[in-house]
Amino acid sequence: NKRKRFVLFYFPYTQSLFGKHGGQDFDQSFKYKYAFSIWPERKNYFREVHSAIAELAVENPDIDFVIKPKSIMMKGESWEYYEQVLNEISFDINKVDNYSIEPDIDVHGLILDSDVFCALQSSTAIEAAISGKPVILPIFENYRSTENYQDFAWKNYLDIFDVANNAQHFKDLIIKLKNCHTVSSHILN
């Protein structure tokens, strides 16, 4: 019996989806000025996503949890904060056999061999969905209520994903979908 596998296509909290620095010189009528406003809750959101995954790894030793960052993402303030979050919740990667960080793993093989995916604005979200696999978008209500959400690439296609409204809903979806081998037919059509 094959072990279930959950994959997070890692995204940094510093990505422009949550706002970017600069733009103070724009005229107040500039249509996209919100994009230069940093979402103040982005670090809390990031903490909630990663804490939920770590908790599930401890609670569900029968599921493998894979964090798939690009190698370049493992440098800088967002990755340092990721490590800080795990440290603050006393999550030791070396003591949990079913949690791994795999920057060099083949993405296409990972998609074919895994059961449930999580991503944000990555093309891998679409690739996994096209492969008939369930994909969770952790776009919690507190993010969806921001102006920055206007720039979320998949916002007009939420019906092809499972959308988590908050951290508990995110955890519930992961557990529910681990036994779901394909996406429902209404999503594929």
Where are these regions (language model features)?
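Conserved catalytic-core segment of nucleotide-activated headgroup transferases in glycan assembly
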Residues: 1-88
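Short, well-ordered coil/turn elements that cap or connect secondary structure elements
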Residues: 2, 60, 93-96, 130, ...
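Residues at the C-termini of beta-strands that transition into short coil/loop
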Residues: 11, 69, 105, 139, ...
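A generic local structural motif
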Residues: 51-53, 103-106, 123, 148-150
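Hydrophobic/aromatic beta-strand patches that form the interior of the parallel beta-sheet core
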Residues: 66, 100, 116-118, 136-138, ...
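Donor nucleotide-activated moiety binding/catalytic core segment of transferases
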Residues: 72-131
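Catalytic binding pocket for nucleotide-activated donors in carbohydrate/polymer assembly enzymes
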Residues: 86-91, 123-188
